[in-house]
Structure formats: structure tokens, C-alpha cells
Amino acid sequence: MPQNADSLAVVLKCRDWENPGVTQLNRLEAHPPFCSWRNADDARVNRDSAQKRSLNGEWTFAWFSAPEAVPESWRTSDLQQADSVRVPSNWQMDGYDAPIYTNVTYPIPVNPPFVPADNPTGCYSLTFSIDADWLQAGQTRIIFDGVNSAFHLWCNSRWVGYGQDSRLPSEFDLTHFLLKGENRLAVMVLRWSDGSYLEDQDMWRMSGIFRDVSLLHKPATQIRDLRINTRFNDDFSRAVLEAEVRTTGERRDDLRVTVQLWDSETFVGEKTAPLGSEIIDERGAYPDRTTLRLNVEHPALWSAETPHLYRAVVQLHAADGTLIEAEACDVGFRQVSIENGLLLLNGKPLLIRGANRHEHHPENGQVMDKETMIKDILLMKQNNFNAVRCSHYPNHPLWYTLCDRYGLYVVDEANIETHGMVPMNRLSDDPVWLPAMSQRVTRMVQRDRNHPSIIIWSLGNESGHGANHDALYRWIKSEDPSRPVQYEGGGANTAATDIICPMYARVDQDQPFPAVPKWSIKKWLSMPGEQRPLILCEYAHAMGNSLGGYAKYWQAFRQYPRLQGGFVWDWVDQSLIKYDDDGRPWSAYGGDFGDAPNDRQFCMNGLVFADRTPHPSLYEAKHAQQFFQFALLPGAECQIEVTSEYLFRHSDNEVLHWSLALDGNPLTAGVVTLDIPPQGRQIIALPALPEAETAGQLWLTVRVEQPQATAWSQAGHISAWQQWKLGEKLATQWPQHAGNAPQLTSSGTAFRIVAGEKRWEFSRQQGVLTQFWIGEEAQLLTPLVDQFTRAPLDNDIGVSEATRIDPNAWVERWKAAGHYQAKAVLLQCDADTLASAVLITTAHAWQYQGETLFISRKTYRIDGNGEMQITVDVDVASGTPHPARIGLSCQLAQVAERVNWLGLGPHENYPDRLSAACFERWDLPLEEMYTPYVFPSENGLRCGTRELLYGAHQWRGDFQFNISRYGQKQLMETSHRHLLQPEAGTWLNIDGFHMGVGGDDSWSPSVSAEYQLSAGRYHYQISWR
């Protein structure tokens, strides 16, 4: 007895999900998103179409360990054990199966095209009704915008088709499957398919119907494709809108196509032509298509700065004017080109201020909603980003529409990555895999080509370089010559890219890896015969407490025109919310779901946390990328030169606030309106500035504010700022106490000093300050001791983990040398009474396994006013690794509500990441001095500090500090921030010197030499009262 062609058994026998030659069955051709309006005015204003219906919502769902476990009866009716889930969603976020986070390593055994027999399978079903008029005429389609990883579709128990490529739509014709009354859809989704070998991106591996599902009803004769291009004369004063329209359905001689162009409510013009009017070659024209050209005088040009959009409405109608169907899209008049080694937009060289962005939501997984998309765009714009790379797959279709409207340049990237293959180009150089790769590239272009925000196509990510790439590069250049193509794989400079687009190339340092060397970005420009622009597809790995040295990249970008910026890795931490036994949420990373293999916290590389609150590094990026640059001009008068890096917009909504302050105390201020043309300058002459009358540092600060709200910012938004230290009137010390010295007493174990209501006790056996009283209140919970270590940053750890030690990682070097285990050996502890002060002198050798790592000498000078001046000299052994810090640490007994300091702030800053910080007097709650990185580490440092006030205490000097309820030991030993427990009192770290955080990448030591503590001797001094 022959098998039913619709049966599960037939589908299982074919095993299409293990055949790279089968990427779809019965799927319709790719095209731009359609709405099939039946009223041209509805199309013009983008009104909801009555011909489009969402199927999002509650679906019936059953989960199985493998497709073979799905009962045949499911195809025809819901199973008794079925539950319900919301579509779109990832089933792992609903408690089925586990998400897996891995970066390079495939989550399944590598045996392409085969996948494990244990292949989790989700069975979805939905019952719905169809309007009677949809059944009478026309075509009804179903559109799945994203399903991971592959799926088969049935309608009313009849098999419809198959699709894979999780990040592009699969669209099927349901017309002949639909019935009057209720209809039932059944969708069998497989977690793994041969397509999974092309989707080895650095992200959580999740499954399910995770993008929108909708029905679309089109007439029998219909628009099947729409391609929009804009062309210009030399000075962009005249343009041509070119609309290529393709149709399908009944052949009719009376069909006409009209394109109308609107500028908001203003009608610009229209053009009408019959089908078949465009002669292609000597054999004639395509009978089902036409190309319409509409001249536009003085078009308003689109750019990320000025995202002016027109609206094109395309109508298919009969000769008598009867409208059959209308489609529409936003149109941006803009031109992308590469000339003389520069990437140009509308004839101007771009400077890409970009971020790589994964589609990630902490609670919804890879399901993106409009609100989150808009939040990302607004944050990018507010922080001076102008570009985004869709890493590493085509995004939700709404994303591009929003980028068009708000103004972001987009690199649209094919859903291809084979990072875990050995060699990496194993599939991209295999012709068997060309059809699968081709579908992912060509369908992306066919869906997204009409978006002006997309300025570059990308062939994918980290898939080596093979003949398949070369073929697909040539296809795109033929199909869409209006955009360049980039591809990093195989060394960033192969023939398959128009742009040199390396990842993690450094500014001045070569990384001569075998086969694929990463030269410094400066060197790359001078390679023989190389004339392409260089735009880093990934740089500045923002993992945890990172982004050190970011300003150095931007100095290079501004110095060398062909260095045209790059895309930070990456935008958002990919942590996921889990709940503890008491229902409290916490942030999870790789391994927290029992997932194996996993790459632990490597999924958290964002400039923002998963909930989109900023990392401190975001402020550094904002400052480095700001569109206004400032220079303090030399001369007797104080003049500031403001340069605009905007290419297309006049500064019509900016005022410059300037202020002069002495040690944070305002002296004078003013406001000037900025009136700067694109790429222009304005000189601002300030009035005569007052001189400092008392000791302190004189700082001039300028801030650019937008008085009026914009589409992406609120009124009062600060877009740029800069500070200059104009001078310093020195007072080398506080006035020395001229009265009697404090009282010094000693015993066999301690030195005790009394000055008024203050008392100090130093251990003679340990040589440290063990206690400090104010009145009867003890101020210390732990002694004041040297500190040379920090709770490791992600950049300090690199790729090291328990099962794979990288001896070159900073933390492993520090461990091996004994920095964390070193013990202090007392060399000296003396006390002397001077005329007006008591002097305690100590010396320690910090040793590990008999080796001396550091020698620390301290002098404590305590006067009768109760001021203790601490002078520290540290010698670093020549053979030991450069230390993380040179400073002091103690646990204060007091827990005060606020912290006040004069120094750089307000946000966390480190020696190689402090360009965005300003020198002022700051005051913040104690809890805001801690940065809640999901993976705990050293955090919260404030550099350039002159004074610190906390509770009853005051410190002065030139130092860096962090202060919080969490000690370095707990930060080092705790895996997740929600496990941290506030400790007794407050931990204070005061550093004379602190190593940078690095960030060129996070897997090799990346702290630049100038920010390492490489000197043999260090000296610093603080006063405590």
C-alpha cells in the first residue's frame, strides 16, 4: 500500500534537513515585504492593510526529543499532552530544552551535513478561519519571518512545504489548501539541520518560531517584486527614481504600472508604463515587468544625519484605471560609492561610528519587539553612533524600516558563519554547499534592497575564504552594483571584498598570524597596490570592564582619511534572565542552563547591559565619536575652535555651554549658539577669564546641548563635551601643624598615637595601621595594607578557564608569579616624635616562595590636628609581571549614604579609558560607585582624584580610588553578580597607580605598554583626616 504523500513518514524518510542541496521545498521567491493594498492612499500613508493578517499569539505546542518521536496523529489533530506557547518565541525561553551558548565550537558533533539523532523537535499548530472573499479569488500566502532551524509545514493535514535559513522569511502559497470555516496549520520545527553548520555565530543557540507569522492575500494578477534605485547627476541637484516592477499571474495586454512619489503630503510626480515596455536585448522585453523612471529636481538627500524619506507608491491597474493592487516603500535619495580609496555617501567620505548588534532580549531570547528596536536605535543615536552591522544575519524586517526613518547606516549580513570548521573554509570552498550559501545571500538582497539605510552588503562572518564567496561576491556586484560588498573571512583583504574590513586589528601593532596576518590598521593602508578603504568590521571588544585604548583608534581614524572607522564588538550583553527559588530574577550566561559545550560569560561583550542600561564604556565611545571637535587656540585671548564633523547637517539645534571652575567650584560661565555648516568651523571668543585667587586646578569645560527635542533625543541632550586644564595654583601641602605633636605610646606589640579625639594603633609585629578611632568609634574593620592585585577583568582572564590555562593571560601570569598569594615580611617598623608630629616608618618585602616581588616603604606623619599623611615608595622586582595596581586597601567600618569626590567622573574610569570623564566635584550614592557587571570583577575606579569625602573621612592627594560594599576577594571568587553579598562596612581602595583595562580584544593581553605598570619604582602620597 503506497504511503500518503502528506504523511510524516514520507517527510522523515526524505530527511531534507540533512541535505545541503535542499534548502526549501515549495517556498516562494524572495521579495521586499508586501502589504497588497487595494487603495493607493492607504499605501501612501502606510495604513494597516486589510489584506494582511497576523497569526501571532497563542499556538498549541508539543515538544519531542527527535522528529521520529512525533506521532502521525499530530499532523491531523492536536495531541492530548500539548501545551500552549506564544508565537513568536524561542521554546527554550518557555522551559522546553535548554539554550546553549557557544562562540566557536559547534553545539553538535561536526559531521556535515548530518545532525544528531537526538534532534529536539517542536510541533506547533493553530486553528484559524479565513474571510470568504479570500477563498473566492486571489492568492493567500503564509509568511514565517524567522524559524530556527528548519521546518515542515502542513495545512489541513496536507503537506505544504519546507524551509530553512532561520533569519530570512519562508513564504508559501496556501490558496489550494484552505477550506471554508476552520483551518489548521501544523508546523514541525527541528532544532538542528544541515543549515546549522552555516549558523555557527557567537550567540545563544535557540529554536522555534521566533519571528512574526502572517497571512497575505494578493490578487491573482499581482506585483511579485519591486526594485527601487536612485540615480544622480554630478552635483546631486537632479535625481532619477527608478522603479523596476515585476508581476505574475494572468497575461493581460491592458495592464499598466504607475509609480507615484510623495514627499510627506506633497505630491512630487508620477510615471505610468505598460508591462513589457523595457527593451532588454535584441530579442525584446520581459512581458511581465517594466521599469519606470521619474525625474526629481533638487531632491532632499537621505543620510543618517538627515534621514529624509519620500514614499513611492506602485500601482498595478487596468487600462481603464481600475486598481488591482498597490505596494509602497520608503525611498531615500542617496548614492553609495567608493572613489579614490574612500567610501562615499552622496559624494562625502563617511566616518563609520558603528556597533555590531545581535538581536537579543534578556527575557524573550532572540524575539525582538518594536519597543526594543527603537530603544537600541535611540541609544545609538544619543551616543554618537551612526552605523550598525547586523551581526551576523539579516535582522527582523522592521529593523531596517526603523533605521531608514531614524537614520543609521547598515551593513546587512548574510546568515553564514562556519567558525568551528577545520579549516574554517571547509564549506565555503565546497561546491556542494554553494546552493545553500547562495540562498542566504541572494534572498537577503532580494528582501532588503530597497532600504536606503543599507549601504553595504556582507557575505557573512568568519567562514574562511572559498570559491563560493567569490561567486556570491560577483553575483551581488552584478545584481546590485549600487552598493559595495564586504567580507572579512580569509584575511579581510581578499578579492571578495570592496573594503578592507579586519577584525581586532590594532592601531600600531602587527599580529602576524599564519595565513591570515592582522597588520596594524596604519600599515594595512600602505600595503603595495592597496587602494581600498579600511573599516574595521569588529574592534574594541567591550567585554565587561573594557574598551581601554578606544580613543587611540579615533585619533588614527581622524588622522588617516582611508581609515574610515569601524564597528565595536558589540552592542548588548547577551545575558538571559533566570529566576531563583524565591522568584527573583538573575542574569545567566553560558553553562547556567546546563548547556554543554559552553563559553561561559563570553556572551557578554556589550556597551550596554541586556536591559539596555549603559556600561561605563558607552560614555567613552560617545565622547570619542562625537561630531563636534574642540581646540583651545593659542594666544592671549581665550578662543575655542569648534569643528563640525557632520557631513550634511547644519548645526541648527546646538548651543555651547562653557564654564570655568576652580577645583570644581564655578567661577564664571556662558552660552553661545553654534552656527556651523557641514564640515565647517566656528571660533568662539570667551570673555576675559578670572584668575585663581586660591590654590587649586583651573578647568575650562565646554558642552554642546540640543535645546530642542529631536526624533531621537530629548530637549537638553548633551552631544559633545571637552575639558582643558588651564593651570594650577599650587599648595604643596595643607598648612603644617605648628602646635604640639600628638601623644605617642608604645608597647611590645603596638604604637599608639592620640591627637584630640582621634587615636591610631599600629601593629609592631605587622607594621600596619590596625585601627583608627574617632571618639569611641573604631573606623577600621581590616588593617590598611598594600594592594598590588585586582579581581580579574575579563580582559585579564582572556581564554583561560579551569580546563584550559593560557599562561600568557595577565591573571595567569599574576597567579604564577604569586601576586595573589604573596605575604608581607616586615623589614622595619619604627616610631619617632618630631616637634609637631609623630612619624611611623615601615618597610615590607612582599614575597612568594622565597622570592621578593615588591618592597614597600611607608611613612605615616600624624600631626596634632589629626591629619595623617602617608608617603609610599614601592620597588617592583625586575622579574615579576607588571602588577595590576600599586595602592592601599582597607575595610572601613562606616557605611555612609553618599560619596563626594573632586576628580574625574561621574562614571567609572580607568587610565586608558578616561577621555569621557570630566574633572569636577561629584556626589553620588554609594551603590552607584559599584558597576554591576554580570561577571564580577574589578570595577568602579575613579581616576585623577584630588579629594575624597566619605562619612567622617577626608582624603587628599593625587590618586585613584574605588569604594563599595564588595571586597576584591569576594569579587574574584564570585561567578555572578546576584551572588555577591554586601560585606560589613565599606571597602576602600586608594591607588597611586593602576594598570589600564585593555580592550583591543579580550583573548590576548591588550593593555598598551603606556598603561602598564612597567617602571621599577613608584612613589605616591595621600593625606587622611
Curated annotation (Swiss-Prot):
Q: Which gene encodes it?
A: lacZ
Enumerate the residues binding Mg(2+) 2.
598
Q: What's this protein's name?
A: Beta-galactosidase
List the top taxonomic levels of the source.
Answer: Bacteria, Pseudomonadati, Pseudomonadota, Gammaproteobacteria, Enterobacterales
The catalytic site is made up of 462 (proton donor), 538 (nucleophile)
Q: Which cofactor does it need?
A: Mg(2+); Na(+)
User: Its catalytic activity?
Assistant: Hydrolysis of terminal non-reducing beta-D-galactose residues in beta-D-galactosides
**Matching Pfam families, A to Z?**
Bgal_small_N, Glyco_hydro_2, Glyco_hydro_2_C, Glyco_hydro_2_N, LacZ_4
Q: Which keywords belong to this entry?
A: Glycosidase, Hydrolase, Magnesium, Metal-binding, Sodium
Q: Which residues bind Na(+)?
A: 202, 602, 605
Q: Which SUPFAM superfamilies match?
A: (Trans)glycosidases (SSF51445), beta-Galactosidase/glucuronidase domain (SSF49303), Galactose mutarotase-like (SSF74650), Galactose-binding domain-like (SSF49785)
Q: Which family does it belong to?
A: Belongs to the glycosyl hydrolase 2 family.
Q: Name one GO cellular component term.
A: beta-galactosidase complex
